[in-house]
């Protein structure tokens, strides 16, 4: 059964079983600090180091955070450099150029590649045994770039993928159907961006598949107009950026869930960015795809069934990624 359900990843080593779990966040902007806050209140790490090129700012952010430690489980949070991150289990990378209003994620790519050139080498110098979690946009491209620059196996370089998109999808669908989002199972896969793919054929509530109840679900012919839900999901980041300048809180919560799945060895399935190696005929690009996460990093990929239309959309998303990768220098 497992052979038919999963594709195993190569993982030469797992995170060591230790009493203390240590992590680092590189980049103390809005996203990095939302992640740090979420991790602090969920007791994700015993020790957390925040790194940023603006040392005074990150020191101020840490001061603000640690004054709240009496209200949560005790942990150590400090500002530092990458040299202070030796021995960490997970490095979360949020550093990068900020997405401008109206700017697509893909237009960020070359600017962020230049930032990653020096950054990844320094991370590997000081944290060679850590799992890398890339949050910087465009996340699928930057995950691939980080993997190549780091020289690590694909199981140890993970992107935040469409974990947030999937959460938005479930939240908005659940709102329509008047159920708890945790009781609704649906995924968005592919690019974290404009070519992402809603998997309507697998969306279900307690095993009741929406596509069996309404075969036209997610299409313009759907009388319930569920396709509007996906349009809201796809445009959510642009709408938030227009109103407040950046997204932060939800990606902070999403990233914390990914890290907890890894460090707590949860074997949890989340749609993270992973190197595709033959699934659905896709090779040598990183896309968001349901993966089993534990202390190995990405342990296995789920062999996900798609409708013919969804399969074509995923192939198109892969082509978008391939074109972008072919056009950058790293």
Curated annotation (Swiss-Prot):
UniProt-annotated binding residues for substrate: 99, 105, 137-140, 165-168, 247
UniProt main location, coarse: cytoplasm
Record Gene3D superfamilies: Lactate dehydrogenase/glycoside hydrolase, family 4, C-terminal (3.90.110.10), NAD(P)-binding Rossmann-like Domain (3.40.50.720)
InterPro entries associated with the record: L-lactate/malate_DH, L-lactate_DH, L-lactate_DH_AS, Lactate/malate_DH_C, Lactate/malate_DH_N, Lactate_DH/Glyco_Ohase_4_C, NAD(P)-bd_dom_sf
Pathway: Fermentation; pyruvate fermentation to lactate; (S)-lactate from pyruvate: step 1/1
Catalytic activity, EC: 1.1.1.27
Active site: residue positions: 192 (proton acceptor)
Pfam families: Ldh_1_C, Ldh_1_N
CDD domains linked: LDH_2
Residues binding beta-D-fructose 1,6-bisphosphate, per UniProt: 170, 185
Domain of life from the UniProt record: Bacteria
Record-level Gene Ontology MF annotations: L-lactate dehydrogenase activity
Record's keyword terms, sorted: Allosteric enzyme, Cytoplasm, NAD, Oxidoreductase, Phosphoprotein
Activity regulation information from UniProt: Allosterically activated by fructose 1,6-bisphosphate (FBP).
Positions bound to NAD(+): 31, 52, 57, 96-97, 135-137, 160
Signal peptide annotation: none
One GO process term, biological-process aspect: lactate metabolic process
Annotated catalysed reactions: (S)-lactate + NAD(+) = pyruvate + NADH + H(+)
Localisation: Cytoplasm
HAMAP family, sorted: Lactate_dehydrog (MF_00488)
UniProt family annotation: Belongs to the LDH/MDH superfamily. LDH family.
Known function: Catalyzes the conversion of lactate to pyruvate.
Quaternary structure note: Homotetramer.
Protein name according to UniProt: L-lactate dehydrogenase
Species, as recorded: Gloeobacter violaceus (strain ATCC 29082 / PCC 7421)
Name of the gene encoding the protein in the UniProt record: ldh
